[in-house]
Amino acid sequence: MPFSLGQRWISDTESELGLGTVIGLEGRMVTLMFPATDENRMFARDDAPLTRVIYNPGDIIESHEGWSLKVSEIEEKNQLVIYHGIHTETGEEVSLRETLLNHNIRFNKPQDRLFAGQIDRLDRFGVRYQSQLLRHKLATSDLLGLQGPRVGLIPHQQWIAHEVGQRFAPRVLLADEVGLGKTIEAGLIIHQQLLTGRAERILIIVPDTLRHQWLVEMLRRFNLRFSVFDEDRCVEAYADHDNPFYTEQLVICSLELLRKKKRLDQALDADWDLMVVDEAHHLEWTEEEPSRAYRVVEALSEVVPGVLLLTATPDQLGHQSHFARLRLLDPDRFYDYQAFLKEEESYKEVASAADALASGKRLPDEAVASLTELLNEKDITPALRLIEDESVDNEQRDQARSELLQELLDRHGTGRVLYRNSRASVKGFPTRIFNAHPQTMPAQYKTAARVSDMMGGQTDLTAKVKQALSPEKLYQAFESDSASWWKFDPRVDWLIDFLKNHRSKKVLIIASQAETALSLEEALRTREGIQATVFHEGMSIIERDKAGAYFAQESGGAQALICSEIGSEGRNFQFASHLVLFDLPLNPDLLEQRIGRLDRIGQANDVEIHLPYLANTAQENLMNWYHKGLNAFEQTCPTGHILFNEFSEELLTQLVYRDEDKFTQLLNHTQSRYKALKKAMEQGRDKLLEINSHGGDKAQKLVENLAARDQDTQLIGSVIRLWDIIGVEQEDSGENAIVLHPSEHMMFPTYPGLPEDGITVTFDREMALSRDDIALITQEHPLVQTGLDLITSSETGTTSVAVLKNKALPAGTIFLELIYMADASAPRSSQLYRYMPPTPVRVLLDKNGNNLSQNVSYESFDKQLSAVNRHIASKLVNASQTLLHPLFAKGEEFAQAAMKQLTEEASNKMTQQLTAELERLEALKAVNPNIRDEELEHLRNQMVELGNYLDACQLQLDAVRLVLVSHA
């Protein structure tokens, strides 16, 4: 290499040293000083890993004094370069000797890095390009926000999320029956709103007892890190902001906290995009006097654009309560209860017409008349003829029915604000089989009860009932630690025998109290060595996760999981199908919650419910009231809490004093009321609303598309390569799972989201659903998103040099592969990414400037290439410089033309889609007042905004690869 004092060079291996100056030449050695870091380096002249820095006309360079010039001419004098050009601020002609260049130079542009010898490994170029393609694919996916959550692909849940999550500021009531997954629906909507940029600040308001359950659910299922706010947290947050709610973007708090005027005022001032209210049916309202809780939520709903209310089914609550929820969503629309009742009468005609269409049977004359009147603004005669014409094939007739149903749906009074699924309308639930196992009351319990009565015992009726239902607690209270109830309780003997006879089965056991659960685990372990684990409210989230994972493990895992009532809230174990109720809760909703741990959509087997109970006791009476009065073991009972409230006094009395005749009378009354309520609910079912809520064939198609994405092996390969390049340690742990650990040789100092102690992940949704301790990896997972960001926001893979061994081409032939990014920068909330996300544009040039990218795919080209070491690569670049400069200019011409085509296509697609949606909503507004003016105005503004962003689209070179043909 020809060196001369004062020349500027850069180190190929230590680019962070900045620009070096030759300060010494002695024999075979050359010494460089790097002023930016105040360090010197000595190199062998013949093979120094150095690259001469010479800029080209058009480059903007900076002097060590801080001013810049645009190079127009280069002069070489005594082996040193002088740059002539125009001062960027004054416009004067100036010159700059290379010795006076800024020392802190960084080569950010790929072409500058290439010519400066900062050449990356071949595989990193590939990972960078694949990362850009992956980001583009995700941004343009019509399933964005639905694939990432660790939830089962349940059609009605995904459908509601798809429909609601894509709206601007959705205001919706989610009122599915228990067990159908309202929390999951809300989580999917939240996840989608965040990923699509429609929402950034979210407030979830829940009952105090459910705060941590929601926190865990949002993190475990949706990878969303919410913060729980209570009074202490608010006080702590004052150090960072006057308004504590501004210190976090995603917040969970209780309604109790917001009852305080100070906290409510702060929440009202916190600029939320979306508010979610769980258990909204507890907000009491009357026209004369709304409750304080209702007024709190009402105040927030007036300032927060998006509102999701999670509530029990309207049938369970009565019309006035239902109207109160709708009023929170749209007070202008639902302004008067009496007017709402009148309007509901008109819904019945719509629902009847929908029933007739959905039945698939011949339409009666009154249905035809109703349809014609309801859809009077368009001619539906051709569709009606098709439906009635038996010579037409079934597919065409079904299509006609479907189109008319859609027309009715669009006109349905609450179809856009209310989603309500019932078990009657959703398929996929298992059969529930109830098995009662009577046991003899032990003498020890009888003695304890007698002693308690003699000592005065409990006087409160409810306390007496609890004592009668849990004799083991009364016994243990007398005996303290001197004896253990589980050593003689026949229910424990039955449980041990049952587990021994079903060794291959996973069994979930639920008891009311944590103490009972711990005692049962001790009994199983000490008496028979049965592998069981406990799950109760005293355990941390991590401890519960470990217990759940131990139970879920197929080989070597626990046979039984013993849960307390509170500890099992929000956890589901569909992989088990045997449920043992060691005792019974004094609440039908809690009983349903217990059974719901196994009786979920996705349960592959019948659910066997086992109840060992003490015969001729309060336990038997309560079992009979649930089973014979409500059929609560084998069917869900949405009216259970209504019946419990009606008959609670009689029931509690009979549980304590046990009069056979009076109890039989109570059972008869309960059965009659149960049948009457069930019939009323069945008659009140709104089939049209159900069709809208579960999505039918469209929902099925949606989950099929999601399932197909889960099977994308290309994604798995890309993610594994991404982690390889970054330097993440990957260890196969069997069962389709991988353990990821940070390594000492990672490319980046930190990898946000990757814990120091590692994380177990899987690409298999079923595996992730069965194991709470395993993360589901999709392209939406934060670990994937962060990995892509680390690569694409750094200089990794921006330059590469490779050799193409192909004797059909002359040796020394060059190809220049250029990857540009076409980017119309815009806020994520604008939704521009749906039409024009940052898009990779590939150009492959031969030495004559011909673009071969249409004929030579990236994959086929990449397979033929071999890597070269950095030093040789730098020499090859220097030897090809004169050929490369005009090729870069030519490449930009091709990329500009491609970008113009992309923006035109995006503009056409955007205009077409938004105009169609706007026209549809404007037409609907004439027949359905639930279309809000804000939605229409938002669409109009969005079209103008997006057009402006597309006009400002920019092109930037992202990566470059030089390829030389070799025959060696």
Swiss-Prot record:
Q: Which gene encodes it?
A: rapA
A Pfam family assignment? Tudor_1_RapA
Q: Which PROSITE patterns match?
A: HELICASE_ATP_BIND_1, HELICASE_CTER
Q: What is this protein called?
A: RNA polymerase-associated protein RapA
Map motif DEAH box onto the chain.
278-281
Where on this chain does ATP bind?
176-183
- Residue limits of the Helicase C-terminal domain? 491-645
Q: Which residues form the signal peptide?
A: none
